[in-house]
Amino acid sequence: MLIAGVRQDVPLTGFLNPRTNQIEGFDVEFIKAITRAIFGDESKVDLRPVTAAARIPSLQDGSVDMVAAAMTITADRKNQIDFSEVYYQAGDRVLVKGDASYNSIQDLGGKRVCTVKGSTAEQNIPGASPQVEVVQADTYNECLLSLQQGRVDAVSTDDVILSGLAQQDPSTKLVGPKFSDEPYGIGVAKGHPEFVAFINGVIQQMKSDGRWKAAYDSWFGRFAGPAPEPPPGTYSN
């Protein structure tokens, strides 16, 4: 049995489906493919919910074998864990109420912008707009609720995550261009190069045989349009 850390609070990417009580999403498609490649049966996996802040610790303490949880590959994180090649290229944008006049992160100087603890957006937001007041939350749903209740002026994180929040609340809208590059990778504890290489092989096959495009179209296509080309294989450890 494979144990995989996933998000359960990120619509379209990794979320708990209330109808099935199963965790689903774009990230989960990669976990299923890896599990199927190992065992011949995609059900032989235990999906363990993790928060953004718990992704790396859960690998380091052996709670999970891998993490596929909208996790950006960064130099600092690569010092702590190993990563697969890039399986999705995201970028930070901004989510605001539909009647708001903000058009970019730069318009939010002096305003309150929510993001999740342990996310790369914590650093990216001040870098893009230094006068923003960053408000931290444990989950993106908490950020969305704060926006709905007027406690913050915007939510900022990866574009695909914001697309999922906008799906939940059609009275919100995404604005502005991406102001960061967020290459997603699957995390593995240090010291398992063969496992990383195996995961890379599965990702590469998905990119070449159409499964990557099918996963993108299934989860993001209605909100983000046709699938782009899969990202090239980079960020080897």
Give names to the regions the model predicted.
Residues 1-67:
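Extracytoplasmic small-molecule ligand-binding "clamshell" domains
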Residues 3-6, 24, 105-119:
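Short loop->beta-strand "edge-of-pocket" segments that line small-molecule binding or catalytic clefts
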Residues 32, 44-107:
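Acidic, polar ligand-binding/catalytic clefts
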Residues 54, 70-79, 124-127, 141, ...:
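A ligand-binding cleft/hinge motif common to bilobed small-molecule-binding domains
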Residues 28-29, 36-38, 119, 186-224:
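Extended ligand-binding regions for polar small-molecule ligands
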Residues 88-96, 159, 163-203, 222-237:
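Periplasmic-binding protein-like
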Residues 6-10, 48-53, 62-74, 98, ...:
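Beta->alpha turn/N-cap motifs
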Residues 34, 59-60, 108, 147-148, ...:
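Hydrophobic residues within well-ordered alpha-helices
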